[in-house]
Amino acid sequence: MKLWAHRGCSQRYPENTLLAFEKAAQLQGLAGIELDIQLTKDGQIVVIHDEKVDRTTDGSGWVRDYTLAELKRLKIDAGCYPHQVIPTMEEVFELLEERLKAGAEAESGTGAGAESGTETGTAAGTDTGSKTGSKPGKMAGLRLNIELKNSILPYDGMEEKIIDMVHDRGLEGAVVYSTFWARSLEKIHYLDPEAELGILDTRISDCMYKLKGGCGATALHPFWRAMDLPAEQLRGYTVRAWMSGHLYPEKSTGTRLKMEWLEELGITDLILNEPEVYLG
């Protein structure tokens, strides 16, 4: 089972912030980080889940009605940590680029053995080389699941912008694109036929319906409690299930899921708010 950080380590730290992503990147054996993107009024890609800023910042209103400079003035409460702001996608790439490039090399088979989602590495995310044959100190690979938040409010040109950004940094192999909107995946597939795509929905049967419709997806991204297809029907597919549940500053329930049971349902990857419970 590969584990991904849902909006970073979003149970203990504010979701979709550089702080949450930095904490996630420190986890030994983490496969990747999931995040959400939207466009500002002036066409900049920012990382935020909700279409409005009300829940996660001290502001109010639609993300699309703010310029980047205006969004940067909004504060995100981070408790005892320095206050956070809504990050741009460029800032996230700058933070994680070295790890993502190692992940891209691992996916393409050109790296020196760095591999995400394994039991190698240290708490700081470096590979000791003891199990993969890589050189001591090599950064362990990390991948990024970029969800385009365009199923409620379509953002014209967001697909082109994010693909260009990923290609400019040479991170194609480190990125999975996902969205609830099948047409957006079709567009990404047209723009970048080699891109890895995941189709989102609540029930896995609805994910499969969209996939069969020709959206170009190779992975199914259902809610983990909505596995309404038999595991036999899911063989050969990447099933990257997502969780909701508690987010910062809510208290953790401390519940640990039984991974063997989830694998029996056909789930191959799990995107969760508190990956540190399993990997820390």
Place the predicted regions along the sequence by residue.
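Phosphate-group recognition and catalysis centered on beta-loop-alpha active-site segments
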Residues: M1-T110, T122-G280
